[in-house]
Amino acid sequence: MPSFTLIVPTYNAGTARWNEWFHAFQKQTNQPLQLIIIDSSSTDDTRNIASTYTNNIIVISPSEFNHGGTRNKALASAEESDFVVFLTQDAIFENKNALEEILSLFNDKNVAAVCGRQL
């Protein structure tokens, strides 16, 4: 399986939701080379919870946030990997193979990008 970096922008994810996200993340059969959380100065426990799973946490001011620029800032700090997966803090994995299924689509040489729908 190819290597990948997982980037997740966050803002006040909430303790219960964030714990649910990390619980589903830990069950994934394919784990990233690197998990990067980019947080827009959350005022709840978002960063504390995230820090138990990764030390790759970037904090920006809320005024710095924009969808593309925020993701690019996180990407600039990423280690080299075969792929990058961008998710949101509220995209809970539907099953333990979700990341593996996303990456498997790149076995088709005609596929350059993949996006999913939220359920």
Where are these regions (language model features)?
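Glycine-rich, basic loop-to-helix element that forms the pyrophosphate-binding segment
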Residues: 62-79
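Short, acidic/glycine-rich phosphate-metal binding loop used to engage nucleotide
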Residues: 12, 59-67, 92
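Conserved donor NDP-sugar-binding/catalytic core segment of glycosyltransferases
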Residues: 92, 96-119
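Acidic donor-diphosphate engagement hotspot in glycosyltransferases and nucleotidyltransferases
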Residues: 46, 71, 95-99
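Hydrophobic targeting segments
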Residues: 3-8, 22-25, 34-38
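A conserved acidic beta->alpha catalytic loop
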Residues: 39-47, 91-92
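Short beta-strand-to-loop acidic/aromatic patch adjacent to the donor-nucleotide binding site
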Residues: 81-92
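Short, well-formed alpha-helical segments that are part of the catalytic scaffolds
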Residues: 13-27
